[in-house]
Amino acid sequence: TLSLHDALPISAFFTAVSALSTCGISIVNATTHWTAFGQVVLLVSVQMGGLGVMTFASLIALAANHHMKATQRLLTANELGTTKLNEIRGVLTVVITTTFIIESVTFLALFPGLYGINRGNVRHTAREALFFAVMSYNNAGFTPDGAGLHVNNWAVGMPIMASAFCGTLGFPVLLNLMRCARHRTPPRRWSLHTKITLVTTFSLVLLSLAWFLLVEWDNPFLFKGADVETRLRYGVVAAVMPRSSGFDLSWVPHIYSNIPIQPD
């Protein structure tokens, strides 16, 4: 049972705004502070924020009335990155399907690694896998426990990073890539938005990785006795995670002061 102090409205309000905006900043421990119902609300809020307000509102309108007003169609088309109003229903379907496919694949990929970490506790493993799957793809930094990201476990860290990276690209880019793959469109004919997003994203990740490894390779506080694989693993996490996903990197205080790592 939560005490009166623990249930302060400011904590609930702050967490709600953080979840809906998918910024992932939490002033309380999401696992110990909130009840099971509260954690479900947190997951749903992040999912709504990840899909987008207009996307979610359009889904409700379609479910209730099977049609949308012209203004709502224009706003939804703008959010989804399409210029054809008659494509909105199909694009919405693709967006929802893509979201749940990626999150389901992430959940299944995370389960074996988390199962080993949790020593065979299926219920706890399923809860953590679901939490990480939703949070990573929607680029929210909430974690299901106080330990933060399992950066030392590739079986857990890699699916989270891959899902977060896909979520970072955004629906318009993912939709364009899927269409190009279906029609076997060569990269030179991809949309300008897709090209700019991919080039910029990969450039930032590669530059961040190179800079982190260059500066931190001999850091005794972070890599004392570590092998090359461990150094690369930390470097990849440091390059991918802070850009958008917002997951806590508990080892950040050990890096050198001239290489700050902060989320966008």
Predicted regions and their residues:
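Membrane-proximal intracellular helices of multi-pass ion channels
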Residues: 1-264
